[in-house]
Amino acid sequence: MHLARLVGSCSLLLLLGALSGWAASDDPIEKVIEGINRGLSNAEREVGKALDGINSGITHAGREVEKVFNGLSNMGSHTGKELDKGVQGLNHGMDKVAHEINHGIGQAGKEAEKLGHGVNNAAGQVGKEADKLIHHGVHHGANQAGSEAGKFGQGVDNAAGQAGNEAGRFGQGVHHAAGQAGNEAGRFGQGVHHAAGQAGNEAGRFGQGAHHGLSEGWKETEKFGQGIHHAAGQVGKEAEKFGQGAHHAAGQAGNEAGRFGQGVHHGLSEGWKETEKFGQGVHHTAGQVGKEAEKFGQGAHHAAGQAGNEAGRFGQGAHHAAGQAGNEAGRFGQGVHHGLSEGWKETEKFGQGVHHAASQFGKETEKLGHGVHHGVNEAWKEAEKFGQGVHHAASQVGKEEDRVVQGLHHGVSQAGREAGQFGHDIHHTAGQAGKEGDIAVHGVQPGVHEAGKEAGQFGQGVHHTLEQAGKEADKAVQGFHTGVHQAGKEAEKLGQGVNHAADQAGKEVEKLGQGAHHAAGQAGKELQNAHNGVNQASKEANQLLNGNHQSGSSSHQGGATTTPLASGASVNTPFINLPALWRSVANIMP
């Protein structure tokens, strides 16, 4: 609005300039025109200065923004380098960890070899002791015809409830397959593992347990130092080994088997307990899913109701899988842990086996050299001591505690106990409550101590290796943390640089804004000056016109011409009275 009026005023003044030739040299109109020209020139110069200031501010801000981006690029590059250093440190730490683990595995292999030698030595010692002691246990067969055959250092095992044959080999256990003919394969120092109810496969390696499958056809073969495995309810075989326990077949009249220096454990048609001692394994499966745990050189493992395979480790117990199909894989020095039909936890220690509990929650804890075995259909716990095995039978909740070279045996269909003294075989016959105790002169096998020492050394070697690997892993983690920390510092620096650059850019933008405001303010001042110049010219023109008008025609005094134009840009008041102007021009002309 002001600019339009300014242009209009300029046009008018140009018109007045054309008339200036008619005026005298000291004509007031000429002064008006000169004042207007000076005001316009000053305004133009001020506007030019304002535009120059704005351009300068924009250029300076652009430079500062460019500096900000350069700083960001530099910090990003530096951070990338630091991250590379951190990753390299982490890789180096991982290489050390892998190297130490490989070294530890080699060391563990050596220790395992020592352990194997110790086991062989212990087995030889046991054999010598067996030569000294010639003791047989008498085993009673109940409710069915059965044959019993005893070999040197073995007990006679009775098969009850079905026709069965029993064959014992020196240093071997008796293995019974239930529900179907079955086979079991065992290796030295291992337990035999039984899988029931479905077809399963079992593979045993040195230091592992052999696994038995029930309800489908399989074989049972055992080697020295293995446990006895029982299967219930069908025709089966039972074999006993030296230093092992007898296994009872349930659901019918039961059998009792005694071992060298061991007790016979009987369980029939109801829940029962089975306990094993070092060199023994009593394994019961009766009328329900049951499980069996074995100890060093012994233990039989039973799996019921579903297919399962079990793999055992050197010097460990066998692990039972029941109620569902499952496979178990064991590693050196470790046990395989299977959980069935419900969730549970299993914890094991080195040299221990993990034993399965079926159909309910169960926990199992094991100590070195023994396994914990859980019974089926109810939740329970079993704890074993070295040289002992706690075995629970199915259909009832029960616990069993063994002491070394003693067996506590429970009879079926009637309440009965069997207590054996060291060197006793306790045999129970089913259908009546009774006790049988045989006292014999047995020896304790010293090979256990030797094997225990070797196992201890092995465990120490493994722990040492794991500790070393743990240290290396700690170093790797520390290196990684260091790299991350360094990268964090660099990122922090980057963030600081970004913040600084942003602050700087903000300052520059602020300066730019201030410069723009200043330039705008300056331009506003110049425009005000221009308006002031126009107003001044208008005042002079009005004064001139008013003076001429007063001398020429008093009828038009005052009026709008007396309105001062100090406001210049007043909205509705014209700053020149055109009729008075023309009258003044006419009066001036001769």
From Swiss-Prot:
Polar residues compositional bias, start-end? 560-570
Q: Which domain of life is it from?
A: Eukaryota
- Report the leader peptide range: 1-25
Induction of synthesis: Up-regulated in differentiating keratinocytes.
Region annotation Disordered: residue ranges? 182-213, 242-266, 297-338, 545-570
Pfam families attached here?
SBSN_GxHH_rpt
Which keywords has UniProt assigned to this entry? Secreted, Signal
Under the heading InterPro entries, the entry gives: SBSN_GxHH_rpt, Suprabasin
From the record, give the cysteines joined by S-S bonds. none
Q: In which tissues is it expressed?
A: Detected in thymus, uterus and esophagus.
Cellular-component GO terms for this entry: extracellular exosome
- Where in or outside the cell? Secreted
Give the protein name, as stated in the record.
Suprabasin
